[in-house]
Each structure stands twice: as structure tokens, then as C-alpha cells.
Design a protein with these regions (language model features):
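Auxiliary, metal-adjacent structural segments of Zn-dependent hydrolase domains
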Residues: 40-43, 54-134, 248-285, 519, ...
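N-terminal accessory alpha/beta regions
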Residues: 103-130, 185-239, 243
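Non-catalytic terminal regions of proteins
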Residues: 134, 141, 145, 161, ...
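Short pre-active-site segment immediately N-terminal to the catalytic Zn-binding motif
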Residues: 134-150, 305-309
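Active-site His/Glu-centered metal-binding helix of metallohydrolases
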Residues: 151-160, 316
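Post-HExxH zinc-binding segment in Zn-dependent metallohydrolases
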Residues: 161-225, 314, 318-332, 344-355
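Long, internal scaffold/assembly segments composed of regular secondary structure
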Residues: 262-361, 365-366, 370
Length: 539
């Protein structure tokens, strides 16, 4: 079965890189208002529990036409029907259709399988991959109503977000990721054959432990095609080794040059991307090991935007599956039975347990994102005086362009900081708590009232700042003339110390660096509060 969207039982495709800008497709202008329905159907689409490929195509055609009426700009779609076991396999390999082998994926698969069989967890109805074409996995155990929900949610909601949001446009190349993963899988497999499973596994273990510290947070990476990458790899390996040799050259020097070298700091400025620094400068890594470090950090970079947009991304997909399927029902395409079935699932997804409820584990990103996009539409269509005061730039304006602008230009932190309204804070009964280490009790710092709106919004916005959730650890210095040790520096956020497992993570840094590693944890005043030290591995 093929169309501009395709439906089949599995497949794969491409890859990102450095040194060449991405030719991201120009985004379409948002529609000022939804387009009218073309014609009303004589009867609704069939709504049996069991699906068929033909029926999925019929539903998909109507969903696609409805999405076009709202101006959703998406990559071409590729739908894959997979089994529950394949869905668990996709879970274990971070949702990608192809990946290199690593024991952690097998461990995750077994844990997921056991929980699923014991009834302790359900499986996602879908997994969607930011690729061009956009790949959406539909589980074959789904009913037809759930397949329709998944197509609207993943193939049009997530897909349009991947294509439109600035973080994904800046940091990822959807047309190349699948080919890159194929390349990574083949390269790691060849390394296993040549150097042994244990040697490759050791490198991957350490790289995975440091993956979140292997991304560029502020500098936009440029990219090469897969063909360019393969052609340039040998030149890059030779050049990198030459640079390492130059850095660690130990030929005798004149006394004045030695004195200057003693005061030389390397790197001249702190470096935030630890894996990049190790790839380029670790003294003892072989070329194949550097390439594996590069592979892990490239994959980590691909997932970086997703870690910053969960509320926006899931909220956007939920908003659009709700909008598209309701529109289809109003237009006469869906039966009452199909409508009730997907609405039940939708209601469960956006449920927000109250504080104190045994199911409460924080704010549900689906609930918050869905509520915020609905609230933006309300502010545009039916603004109150309060809305006009808080959101003068969008109050009373067409809602489609306002929603499109919000989706494209924000991440979770700034989205909440810009668009969370007093009305929504009241409806969700939000409040802010301060946990002061010097106090015995928690303090309610602000509630959803006139004096607390901005403080509640700022506090919630900060929760989605990666800088407040992950430790800020930077490469500080390398002892070029002595023991070749590497010094890292941790900049505390709000006086928060590192996790007690920091020493174990440093062992992975030492394995990759090849020599001893020091870590200094400093407070806001720049004073060192704690030191960690790990010796280099035995050579």
C-alpha cells in the first residue's frame, strides 16, 4: 500500500553531520482560518474493532484531508504496523528502527517484556520517529479506532511539530538520521569483529554514561551527507591523530618555552561538550574508538530537542488528534462508537492526578500541553479583559497563526513562561513550593492568585530548564606537562550537590581519557565545595 503516506510492515532509511549547513525546508505560512469541508460523506467510515490495510488507508485519507484544511505542514508519512514484541524492541532501542547492538537495549527489552506480561504496564499505542519520511509505528493489537487516533496524533501532530519547531530545524536533519543509524550499526559491528565485543562494549558503556554531556547546547552543528561523511572519515581520523600528537608532543624545548608551557591553559576556555572534547583530544584513543565516541554524541545530539520540548510536542500532538477527530465526527466521517472509544483513551492520557493522589508523579506533560494550546485558542477567540492585559499580542487574533507561532518558536521553558495564563493556573490549581535546605519545613511561596501568578509561572518554567535538571559540568583544564590528568568543573545550581554516584561516572571519563580525572564542584561564589578524583586506568 503506497500513497504520499505509506503503510507497511517495517523498513529503514538515513544520517546527520558537521561542516555544511542544513537546507531545511521553508515552512508554510499558517492559514488564517480552517478551510471549509469539501463535501459531506453519504455515510460514516466503517468502525469495526478489527482493522485492515484498506480501512487504515481510508481513515488516513480523511485524516490527511482534514489536516490539510487546518494547514498542518508535515513530512511525508510512512506507517509501519508492528507487533507488541516489536513495539517492546522499539522501546528498548530508544524508538529507533535500527541501531547498533548494546547490552543495555537487551536489558530494557527484558524489563519491559516482563512488566507487560505481568500486567504491570501497557504499551504505547504508537512510536513516531523524526525522519523524512516521518515513520509512525502502529501496534497491530490496536483497534481501528485506536489506529485512527495514532495516525492523527503521530503522523500529523508529532510530524508537524518535528518539521516546524525551531529546535528540531536547528539541531536535527530528519532526512539523514535513518541512514546515519544504519552506518552506525554497521560500523560498530565491524569494530566488534576486528577488536572484540568486550573492547567495543567498554567504549560504548562509557559513552552512554556521558551521553547527556555530549551535546552542543548553544552552537548549531553543521552537517554532511552520509556519502561525504564516509569519504572524509579517513582524512578526519588522520587529522585528528595529528592534532592529538601535536597537543601531546614531548620533544625537548628551550627553558623559556617550557616556562611558557607551564602557564598555558588547555582548553583556553571551558568546554561544555565533554564527549566532543574527548573525541578530539584524548591522548590514547585509537581512530575506531574516536569514531564510536562521535557516533554516540551524534545520536545524543539528535535527541537533544526532544528533551526540551516534551510538554509542547505531546501537547501539540494531543491537541491535533483531538481537533482532527472531532472535526471528522462533526463532518460525518466517524461513528459514535469510534468516537467514544478514542475519547476514552484521550481522557486517560490527559488525566492530571492531584497532589497527594497515589498516582501523582508531577505535572502530566500531555495534560499541561493540551490545556495550554486549547487556552491559546480560547484567548484568540474569546478573550477576557484579563487575557487582553496578559496577552495583548494574541488576544482577539486568528487562532491558527497564533498556535503556529507558539509551536514554531518556543521550547518548554519559554512556552510555559510566555503562554501559561492566570485562568489556566486557577483551573489547574497550581502553586509553588520552596525547599530550603536550611529550613525544616517546605514553604508555599506562591498560589494561583493576583500576587502569585507570575511567580507560579516562573517557577514552573524553571522546571523545564535543562540547566536546572542536569548538572553543568565543563572541561576546565588539562595538565599538559605533568600527569596528563583532566580537570572537570561542576557549577552548582541553587547549591545542589552532585549525585552520590558521581564517582562512578568519573571512572567512565577516565576510561575514555586514558589518565586520571579530577572534578571540582563549585558554588555560586566560585568556591570549591567538594573534590572528586579517579586514577587513570592501568595501561
Amino acid at each position: 500500500m503506497r500513497s504520499s503516506a505509506t503503510c507497511s510492515r517495517r523498513k529503514a532509511r538515513r544520517r546527520p553531520e558537521e561542516d555544511e549547513p542544513v537546507n531545511a525546508p521553508t515552512p508554510k505560512a499558517a492559514l488564517a482560518a480552517p478551510l471549509p469541508q469539501r463535501e459531506r460523506p453519504a455515510e460514516a467510515l466503517p468502525g469495526p474493532s478489527d482493522w485492515s490495510f484498506e480501512l487504515i488507508e481510508q481513515y488516513h485519507a480523511v485524516i490527511r484531508a482534514t489536516a490539510e484544511r487546518f494547514g498542518l505542514d508535515t513530512y511525508p508519512n510512512q506507517l509501519e504496523i508492528i507487533s507488541a514484541e516489536q513495539m517492546m524492541d522499539a522501546y528498548a532501542s530508544v524508538g529507533m528502527p535500527v541501531n547498533y547492538r548494546h547490552w543495555s537495549y537487551g536489558k530494557e527489552f527484558i524489563a519491559t517484556e516482563k512488566s507487560y506480561k505481568r500486567g504491570h504496564m501497557g504499551l504505547a499505542y504508537e512510536i513516531v520517529i523524526n525522519a523524512n519520511p516521518c515513520i509512525s509505528y502502529l501496534m497491530e493489537e490496536n483497534t481501528m479506532a485506536m489506529q485512527a487516533l495514532v495516525i492523527a496524533h503521530a503522523a500529523y501532530g508529532h510530524n508537524s511539530f518535528f518539521k516546524g519547531n525551531y529546535l528540531f530545524r536547528m539541531w536535527t536533519d530528519a532526512s539523514s538520521i535513518i541512514d546515519y543509524l544504519v552506518y552506525a550499526k554497521d560500523y560498530v559491528a565491524k569494530c566488534e569483529e576486528k577488536h572484540g565485543l568486550e573492547a567495543v562494549e567498554d567504549i560504548l558503556d562509557s559513552c552512554h554514561a556521558l551521553a547527556n554531556h555530549g551535546v552542543d547546547r548553544y552552537r548549531r552543528p553543521s552537517r554532511k551527507s552520509l556519502a561525504q561523511e564516509l569519504a572524509d572519515r579517513k582524512d578526519r581520523e588522520a587529522y585528528a591523530q595529528q592534532q592529538v600528537n601535536d597537543l601531546w608532543r614531548t620533544l625537548p624545548r628551550k627553558a623559556e618555552k617550557e616556562a611558557a608551557a607551564e602557564t598555558r591553559r588547555f582548553p583556553e576556555e571551558p568546554q561544555e561538550n565533554l564527549l566532543y572534547f574527548i573525541e578530539k583530544n584524548a591522548p590514547l584513543l585509537e581512530p575506531w574508538q574516536r569514531e564510536i565516541v562521535r557516533i554516540v554524541r551524534k545520536v545524543a545530539q539528535y535527541f537533544y530537542p526532544q528533551r526540551q520540548t516534551q510538554v509542547m510536542n505531546e501537547g501539540w500532538a494531543t491537541f491535533w488528534h483531538y481537533k482532527l477527530l472531532n472535526t471528522m465526527y462533526d463532518d460525518g466521517w466517524l461513528t459514535d462508537g469510534v468516537m467514544i472509544e478514542w475519547l476514552k483513551s484521550h481522557t486517560n492520557v490527559i488525566y492530571q492526578p492531584p497532589v497527594g493522589h497515589r498516582a501523582y508523579s508531577g505535572i502530566n506533560p500531555y495534560a499541561l500541553g493540551f490545556a495550554m494550546y486549547n487556552d491559546i485558542q480560547r484567548i484568540c477567540e474569546h478573550p477576557t479583559d484579563e487575557d487582553r492585559q496578559w496577552f495583548p499580542e494574541i488576544a482577539g487574533t486568528p487562532w491558527l497563526p497564533a498556535l503556529d507561532q507558539a509551536m514554531r518558536n518556543y521550547k518548554d521553558e519559554s512556552f510555559v513562561g510566555q503562554f501559561l495564563s492566570p485562568r489556566l493556573m486557577r483551573e489547574m490549581r497550581l502553586f509553588s513550593i520552596v525547599d530550603d535546605e536550611h529550613e525544616d519545613e517546605l514553604e508555599v511561596a506562591a498560589i494561583h492568585d493576583d500576587s502569585g501568578y507570575r511567580r507560579v509561572r516562573e517557577a514552573l518554567s524553571r522546571q523545564y530548564d535543562l540547566g536546572s535538571r542536569e548538572p553543568n559540568i565543563q572541561v576546565w583544564n588539562v595538565n599538559l606537562r605533568g600527569d596528563r590528568s583532566l580537570t572537570l568543573r561542576h557549577f552548582q545550581h541553587n547549591g545542589r550537590p552532585l549525585h552520590e554516584g558521581a564517582h562512578e561516572v568519573l571512572k567512565h571519563v577516565a576510561r575514555l581519557w586514558g589518565f586520571g580525572v579530577h572534578l571540582e564542584s563549585v558554588d555560586a561564589a566560585g568556591e570549591i565545595r567538594k573534590r572528586y578524583q579517579v586514577p587513570g586506568p592501568a595501561h
